[in-house]
Amino acid sequence: MNIYSTSVDTLTTERPPKVSMFSVWPPLAIEIDMWAEGGISDARVNVMKRVQGPKTSILARWNDHPAGVGFAAVHGKNAFVHAVEIRSTQRQQGVASWLMKQAAFWAAEQGASRLNVACTNANVAANALYRSIGMKVVGGYHYRMKG
């Protein structure tokens, strides 16, 4: 698992296009559906709902359709992004980059100065995305799952 971090200033130089990214809490039904499509279980969504402090879902709209979803929460000066899912038909169009920028703007509005995200080593596309938007690996961990 890679843990990426960057200053919110790195990602707040250009706002996402109008009516493309929405910070919403509680999450809309379409967001929960997109999380489910991406393998994010109800149990994980329930963990997001229990988070204390500032939190938001981010709904991405692209080509006039729901395109992706993510979750962000702030603790102190750190914002953490989780559960980023982009619909397969909307990938390779910059949606995830804009979603991360929206997360950074939202985080800055909450007083955060850092944006962080964890990503499995196996997720080549997401690792490339986070590097391409200026995030740096600041740590990592390995875990085993019984199965």
Task: Report the location of each language-model feature.
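Helix-loop element at the rim of GNAT/NAT acetyltransferase active sites that forms part
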Residues: 24-26, 34-43
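Conserved GNAT acetyl-CoA-binding A-motif
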Residues: 107-118
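Conserved acetyl-CoA-binding loop-helix of GNAT-fold acetyltransferases
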Residues: 86, 92-105, 109, 128-132
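Conserved beta-strand-loop-alpha-helix junction that forms the acyl-donor binding cleft
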Residues: 117-127, 144-147
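Acyl-donor-binding surface of acyltransferase catalytic domains
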Residues: 1-29, 144-145
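Short acidic/polar active-site loop segments enriched in Thr and Asp
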Residues: 77, 113, 136
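A conserved beta-strand-loop-helix scaffold within acyl/acetyltransferase catalytic domains
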Residues: 46-87
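Conserved acetyl-CoA-binding loop of GNAT-fold acetyltransferases
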Residues: 131-140
